[in-house]
Amino acid sequence: MLTSAGRCLLLGLMGTVPLLGAAPPAQVIWRGDFETGNLDQWKGAPKSDAVKVVQDIVREGKYACRIDGSNAARRGSLDRIEFQHQPEPPGTAEGTERYFSWSVYLPKKFSDAVHHVGYFETRNSWSQLMSFEAKGEDLKFSTRVPYKLHWTGNGKLTPGRWHDFALHVLWSRDPAKGFVEVWFDGEKVVPLAKTATLRDENVAFFQIGLIRETSDVPESIIIDHVVEATTLKDVTPPPLPKGR
């Protein structure tokens, strides 16, 4: 039978042991929201005069980033002015679970050329793992290990307003373990879907910007609220004020 002193000691020891099965604390891991007033949050920022931090059109806070692109940025068959975010380990390692979000604003409707408005690619082997593609106002989301189209949003990418993307992913080469979920403008458009989300041992990284089939038509995109976190709540931006 424990004495009073023994019970106090036991309770004290129990207080130092974490509860088994307790959920990890919610955490914002990284922000690329330009609230520094520059591009310093991004290790992989484009070096281009077409890129500037702006204050007139923002999703939240004081700053966003505008890209005014043309085929002067042509590389191969694509015009590319893009930001890269490489999650810190274990960000895209086997079994890691993450949420990512970003918001885009188009001053004018995209052309009917293929545009990428957020995608993940492998380092070293340079292979896309999943992508949001746009033609005009039409969107689609697909995974690539192997290719599967998960969502088509015809007429959803309207110009003159902000659009919010959120992605929940468990990184795995095993199609029975990996999964994706997608939200667009606050609505879940892809329920949890099992799929391989890694192709090989190479880490994945995120790219966003003006990435399109090369075209003579100048186009612009404004980017804000790029976030990596451990919960949907932590990547969800505040509600939009009317008119934005």
Residue map of PLM features:
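Bacterial N-terminal signal peptides that target proteins for export
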Residues: 1-12
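Serine/proline-rich low-complexity intrinsically disordered segments, especially terminal tails, linkers
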Residues: 6, 17-20, 133
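Low-complexity, Ser/Thr/Pro/Gly-rich disordered linker/stalk regions
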Residues: 23-244
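Bacterial Sec-dependent signal peptides at the C-terminal "C-region" and cleavage site
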Residues: 13-27
